[in-house]
Amino acid sequence: MRYRRGASAERELVKLLESKGFAVLRSAGSHKIDLVAGNGKEYLCIEVKSTRSRKLYLPIEDVEKLVEFAGRFGGRPVLAVKFVNVGWRFYGPNRLEHGEKSYKIDLETPFMTLDGLLGKQRTLEGVL
């Protein structure tokens, strides 16, 4: 069930990014990243997660793989989390705190909206 929810979230995010003018490639399976998106000016390397919980733990090595790939690709690393019944939230890995083994993201963690991520934010949602 988790795989299906995650794949569904990936497809939903693909449609959202395409509606904002991005070309998007989805990498199905357990690879380094889930989505690569670009619009000719900006390139995003995205790890997608979906959870019914109010918090999420990501292994440090998964985030490091994302950052490493994005660096080699010339893109910006992004963690996209869909909190079910809350919505999408976007995080830059360098702005997250982590413990010895994992990063923790919860509903209190400062985040960006999709428009904020793309530099088109018009409200303070997620900023404060």
UniProtKB/Swiss-Prot annotation:
Subunit structure comment from the entry: Homodimer.
Molecular function GO labels: crossover junction DNA endonuclease activity; DNA binding; magnesium ion binding
UniProt site positions, description: Transition state stabilizer: K49
UniProt entry keywords in alphabetical sequence: DNA damage, DNA recombination, DNA repair, DNA-binding, Endonuclease, Hydrolase, Magnesium, Metal-binding, Nuclease
EC primary class: hydrolase
SUPFAM superfamilies: Restriction endonuclease-like
Residue spans crossing the bilayer: none
Top-level division of the source organism's lineage: Archaea
UniProt record similarity statement: Belongs to the Holliday junction resolvase Hjc family.
Catalyzed chemical reaction(s): Endonucleolytic cleavage at a junction such as a reciprocal single-stranded crossover between two homologous DNA duplexes (Holliday junction)
Location of the active site: S30
GO biological process assignments: DNA recombination; DNA repair
InterPro entries named in the record: Hjc (IPR002732), Hjc_arc (IPR014428), Restrct_endonuc-II-like (IPR011335), tRNA_endonuc-like_dom_sf (IPR011856)
N-terminal signal peptide: none
Gene giving rise to this polypeptide: hjc
Chain sites annotated for binding Mg(2+): E10, D34, E47
Listed Gene3D superfamilies: 3.40.1350.10
Alphabetized Pfam families for the sequence: Hjc
Cofactor binding remark: Binds 1 Mg(2+) ion per subunit.
EC number(s) on file: 3.1.21.10
Cofactor: Mg(2+)
Protein name listed in UniProt: Crossover junction endodeoxyribonuclease Hjc
Free-text function comment from the UniProt entry: A structure-specific endonuclease that resolves Holliday junction (HJ) intermediates during genetic recombination. Cleaves 4-way DNA junctions introducing paired nicks in opposing strands, leaving a 5'-terminal phosphate and a 3'-terminal hydroxyl group that are subsequently ligated to produce recombinant products.
Consequences of knocking out this gene: Not essential, it can be disrupted. Cell survival is unaffected by several DNA damaging agents.
